[in-house]
Amino acid sequence: MALDALASILETVLRNCGINEISRVTTKFEEALDDCGMKVDDWREAYYKERFPKRMTATTMASQIMNFEIENLQLRNKAWAEGADRKFRLLSSFEIGNKDGHTILVPKTRNAEILLANSTSDLKLSSFPSEAVAKLAEENEKMRKQIEHLREQQTSKSTATLCEALENMTERMKLIEREKETVRRMFLECDKTNQRLRKQIQICEEEATDRLVLVNSHHREEILIMKREIYRLQMENVTLKEQIDSIEQELDHSNRIVRGLANRAGLVVDEVDSGNETSDLSDDSDHDDHENSESDLEDMMDPGEDERIPRGGENPRRQARMLQMREEMERLHEDMEILNLNLDLDI
C-alpha cells in the first residue's frame, strides 16, 4: 500500500518533468526498493501498531480515568489506615543526597519539587554577628569609595584629553576643508582649461582635415591634368613618328627617282643616309623642300664642274626639328618622373 503510494508520487513527478517510459521507471523503482530491503509496507504497519495506542471511544476513556481515580483513592485510604499521615507522606517524597560535601534534599515527585521551590524562594539566612565581619565591611566600603574617586578622576582626565583632541581634530577638519575647497577650485580651472584645449584641438583637427581634403583633391586634379598632358604628348609623339616615317618613305622614293634620272643621264650620285634626314611639317618647309628638289633635279640634268661634289649635306631645319623633338622628349620624361613621385607621396 505505502509502496504503491510512493510509486504513484514518482509517476506524477516524472509526468510533470516530461519524461517518457514512466511505467518502466516506476517498476524499476519498486524493484530497487524491494531489492535493497526497504519494506515500506512492513514499516508502516509496525509504526501504527506499536507507536500509537489502540483507538478507543470517549466513554471507554472516561471509564478508564474513573477507575484510575478510584484506585488512587483506595491506595491513599490504605496508607492512611497504616499510619501514613500528611507528614509521613511529605517526607517520603524526598530522599537525602550529597552535593559538594553538603547534605541536600532530593525531590522524587512533582509535588515535592513544587514544595521545595515554595520553601526556598523567600529563604534568607540570618546574619551571624562578628567584629571581624564588621571591620571587613567597613574596609570594603572605604575601598569602594576610593575606587569611585579614582574612576571620577580618570573620567575627568579622559574627558579633558578627549576635549583637547576634539578641538585639535576640529581645527584639522577646518584646515582640510579649506584645502579641499582650494583643490576643488583648481580642478574646476583645470577642467575649464581642458575643455578649451579640447575645443581648440577639435577645431585644428577639422581645419587639418579640410586642408587635407583640399590638398588631396588638388593633387588628384593635378594628376588628372598630368595624365591628360602625358596622353596628349604620347599621341603627338605617335603622330610625329608617323609623319617622320612618311617623310622618310617619300625621301627614299625621291632618291630612287633621282638615281634613276641620274643613271639615264649617265651621272654619278653620292649615297646619302636617308634615315637621319627629315623635313619640316609646316607648309613653308614643304614648299622650300619642293623648290630645292626641283633645283637639284635641274642641276642633275645640267651638270657642271662641281657635279662630283655632294649636294645637300646636313639640313639646318632638320637639325633644329630633331633638337626640338629631343627637348620635348626630355620634358616628357621629367613630367613622367614628377607624376610618379606625386603618386608615391599620395600612397
From Swiss-Prot:
Residues 274-321 are annotated as: Disordered. One of its GO terms (molecular function) is RNA binding. GO terms for biological process: regulation of translation. GO terms for cellular component: host cell cytoplasm. Keywords: Coiled coil, Host cytoplasm, RNA-binding, Translation regulation. CDD domains: NSP3_rotavirus. Residues 274-286, 294-305 have a biased composition (Acidic residues). Residues 230-257 form a coiled coil. InterPro entries: Rotavirus_NSP3. Residues 306-317 have a biased composition (Basic and acidic residues). It comes from the Viruses. It is found in: Host cytoplasm. May play a role in stimulating the translation of viral mRNAs. Belongs to the rotavirus NSP3 family. This is Non-structural protein 3. The lineage of its organism: Viruses, Riboviria, Orthornavirae, Duplornaviricota, Resentoviricetes.
